[in-house]
């Protein structure tokens, strides 16, 4: 829920991630490693992680892979991603609110780095699930950031 008490939907957090609609200065994982986002990836409307082909650095390492988004840390396990190999390529778990007692691990028992967005948001204006989803679809159709070329040539 937002501070106003209005419900927040996962699609809204996905929209925020897709548009990078947050203060990206000083981004860090919940365990303190610096994050730099080069590309948030492409929104996946099918099975599997929420965003594919994301590019980012965590600490001194560069990553290319998937990003999964949830309202809270517990969403990872609640949705069964810890038991689904389709989520083994996730490089970052983005949540609105971090829950310290909910570790995020894939089927290979590797811990997935987590980013809590709440401290980086200026204001969270709740939108309906339908509004957020429609906006994500429009973002997906934009050719910005060399989108057309990347989509046609991305491995």
Regions found by a protein language model. Name each.
Residues 55-66:
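Active-site beta-strand-loop-beta-strand hairpin of nuclease catalytic cores
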Residues 95-155:
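Internal, well-ordered alpha/beta segment that forms a basic, Gly-enriched binding/recognition surface
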Residues 30, 41-43:
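C-terminal structured domains
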Residues 64-72, 93-95:
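Active-site ExK catalytic segment of metal-dependent nucleases
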Residues 83:
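Divalent-cation
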């Amino acid at each position: 829920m937002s501070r106003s008490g209005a419900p927040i939907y996962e699609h809204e957090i996905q929209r925020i991630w897709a548009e990078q609609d947050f203060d990206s200065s000083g981004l860090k994982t919940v365990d303190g490693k610096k994050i730099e986002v080069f590309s948030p990836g492409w929104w996946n409307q099918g099975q599997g992680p929420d965003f594919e082909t994301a590019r980012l650095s965590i600490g001194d390492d560069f990553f290319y892979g998937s990003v999964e988004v949830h309202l809270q840390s517990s969403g990872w396990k609640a949705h069964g991603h810890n038991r689904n190999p389709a989520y083994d390529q996730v490089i970052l778990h983005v949540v609105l609110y971090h829950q310290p007692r909910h570790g995020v691990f894939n089927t290979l028992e590797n811990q997935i780095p987590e980013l809590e967005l709440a401290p980086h948001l200026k204001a969270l204006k709740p939108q309906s699930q339908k509004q957020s989803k429609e906006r994500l679809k429009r973002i997906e159709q934009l050719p910005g950031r060399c989108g057309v070329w990347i989509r046609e040539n991305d491995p």
